[in-house]
Amino acid sequence: MKKKCFKKSYKNTLLYFHKNYITVENTNHSGRFADTIIMHDCEHPIMKEHAKICTKNGGDILEVGFGMGISAGYIQSGSIKSHTIIENHFQIADRARDWAADKPNVTIIEGDWRDVYLEKKLKKYDGIFLDPNDIMGSEKMFIDPPFTITKPGCILTFYNGINRSDVHRGYKENENPEVLKIPGTEFRSFKWKQDTLFWGLHQGEIYFLPKKVF
């Protein structure tokens, strides 16, 4: 799973790649270093739903945060024209470029997504999926006009969670102050059916899928 819990130095932190997950060396509550899982392939069902939302219009899709490439794979399976991916971590950006090597409709941009936006390196998109390391506190980019990279009817969805160093679940906007607050966002409930734990989300519990249409 992609990363929400690390500071600006995250992009230079060494990651460790395992078969089903990715870890980073992190300081625990006792002050000792311990491996923290920051991405895990148990998120397939959630990422599939996010991909369905952002690719509903087809066309040009922007994905922020490549992670393990799970959501990217589902986005590619949709009827889309182009797929732009912004990834800030150097190791993951390398993996994204390897993944995209045989996909002519994919463009990989390495860098902080806010910088890429402010530097006007992006076009307009029909769908956007946000799952970067540091999504919290990003509301201003969507509230203060003009947000210039959305076509009319563009569908935005974003990972609905908080600190991934702790077990947690997705929350509705009015249930947790740390959820990204973008006016006009609707939430659709998704029942977690798998018996595999998803960041503290147990079988039968609900994850709330955000959607905003511009």
Which ranges hold each PLM region?
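Class I SAM-dependent methyltransferase Rossmann-like catalytic core
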Residues: K2-N57
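Conserved acidic residues
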Residues: G59, K81, D126
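C-terminal substrate-binding/active-site "lid" region of AdoMet-derived donor-dependent transferases
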Residues: I92-R95, W99, M136-F214
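Conserved SAM-binding loop of SAM-dependent methyltransferases across substrates and taxa
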Residues: M68-I80
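Conserved SAM-binding motif I beta-strand of class I
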Residues: S82-E87, F158
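A short acidic, Gly/Pro-enriched loop at the edge of an enzyme's catalytic core
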Residues: E119-I128, P132
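S-adenosyl-L-methionine
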Residues: N88-K121
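Conserved class I S-adenosyl-L-methionine
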Residues: N57-G67
